[in-house]
Amino acid sequence: FNASGVATRALSNVKADQVIDQFTHRRAMSHLSKGRVVIVAGGTGRPFLTTDTAAVNLALELDCDVVIKATKVDGVYNRDPARYPDAIKLDQLTHDESVARPDIKVMDKAALGLASEQQIAIIVCALLKDGNISRAARGEAVGTIIR
């Protein structure tokens, strides 16, 4: 992000002080108030709470408009593209569709339901495609948007 001109700070819920600053609400809000993109790694460190749900919870806590889920696929498909070569990529979905459709498996239903209830958009894009996350953070069309 920083290299592409987007001011960014990474924080972690898992203690790793030599590598990354620890997440605190105050630290994250300070970075956000300065116009920086905040990336939070490490989930919540709590059992029975997926990283997907943790991401949506953090978005709520930090009053974010969008969650970017960078993953191994380049968006949401109507079925598993690894198993079905004829799977169709969906450019956008409503929250209701993402929760109701059993074929949507890129995120857990608890996270999708919480995002739906709180009207937080989710962008699903490929982690390893160069520039994807930066483009998503700048509001450019990438992957699939759920809103």
Task: Identify the function of each model-found stretch.
Residues 1-147:
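C-terminal catalytic "cap/lid" subdomain
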